[in-house]
């Protein structure tokens, strides 16, 4: 039967198919320390684990909850764990600079910043990176981490064209485009065993009996991500004086 099943895999030409005993592309074989025990426990089920090394992980929250801060911490720990590894950082907010990266003691010579404006641009460039990575001999592949900061700031080709033409109509296709992007990327990431960390914005759900937050961009990321961590904050006071914010994490 084993030979028959192997023949079936060969005949179908499915590049993602394999015997379960040989390991599936979705199997988690390694974890990346996030630099935070709470984050490690939420994402990996143990304070000693962390970010699954071949999954999509989303970090969502309102402004100033530390999304980029935590992501840069993950980049640092990934590079520290993998001295021959690299990070591709897709950036849509123009917020990350060389000074910020080097102040966090991140090896800037092993990190690439790729500014992206639209969902389509991110999808195309991410696929190019993954195809190039998969084309290498498995023995020659060095550890790679992909980051998108942030999905919420990505526009679409249609939105840009409408803005340039002076149209004020809302782009109703964005959610479908986001969903299509992750339909293409999810299997590729699993096959390549490359993790993708995405930050996203949240908004308050209107009309809900109990106040709750929802991610922007439709349901595409919600279904594609293996883990979603929501960040929130509250003010820390000393008497009546506000002395800072406390960030809260929950899945």
Put a short name on every predicted segment:
Residues 171-249:
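Phosphate-binding/switch region of NTP-binding enzymes
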Residues 80, 104-111, 162-171, 213-218:
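A short alpha->loop->secondary-structure connector
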Residues 39, 101, 149, 200, ...:
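Residue-level signature of catalytic and energy-coupling elements of molecular machines
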Residues 32-36, 40, 53, 68-69, ...:
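Amphipathic alpha-helical transducer elements in NTP-driven molecular machines
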Residues 2-110, 122-131:
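The Walker A/P-loop phosphate-binding site
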Residues 118-191:
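Phosphate-binding/switch loop-helix module in NTP-utilizing enzymes
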Residues 93-97, 117-121, 151-154, 202-206, ...:
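Conserved nucleotide-binding/hydrolysis micro-motifs of P-loop NTPases
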């Amino acid at each position: 039967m084993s030979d028959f099943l192997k023949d079936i895999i060969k005949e179908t030409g499915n590049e993602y198919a394999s015997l379960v005993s040989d390991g599936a592309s979705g199997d988690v074989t390694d974890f990346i320390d996030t630099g935070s025990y709470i984050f490690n426990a939420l994402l990996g089920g143990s304070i000693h684990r962390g970010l699954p090394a071949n999954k999509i992980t989303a970090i969502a929250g309102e402004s100033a909850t530390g999304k980029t801060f935590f992501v840069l911490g993950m980049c640092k720990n990934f590079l520290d764990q993998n001295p021959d590894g690299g990070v591709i950082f897709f950036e849509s907010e123009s917020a990350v600079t060389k000074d910020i990266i080097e102040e966090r003691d991140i090896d800037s010579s092993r990190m690439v910043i790729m500014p992206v404006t639209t969902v389509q641009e991110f999808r195309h460039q991410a696929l190019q990176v993954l195809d190039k990575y998969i084309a290498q001999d498995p023995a020659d592949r060095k550890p790679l981490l992909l980051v998108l900061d942030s999905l919420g700031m990505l526009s679409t080709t249609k939105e840009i064209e409408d803005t340039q033409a002076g149209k004020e109509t809302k782009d109703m296709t964005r959610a479908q485009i986001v969903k299509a992007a992750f339909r293409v990327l999810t299997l590729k990431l699993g096959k390549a065993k490359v993790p993708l960390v995405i930050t996203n914005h949240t908004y308050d759900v209107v009309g809900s009996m109990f106040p709750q937050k929802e991610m922007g961009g439709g349901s595409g990321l919600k279904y594609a991500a293996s883990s979603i961590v929501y960040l929130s904050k509250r003010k820390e006071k000393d008497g009546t004086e506000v002395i800072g914010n406390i960030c809260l994490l929950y899945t």
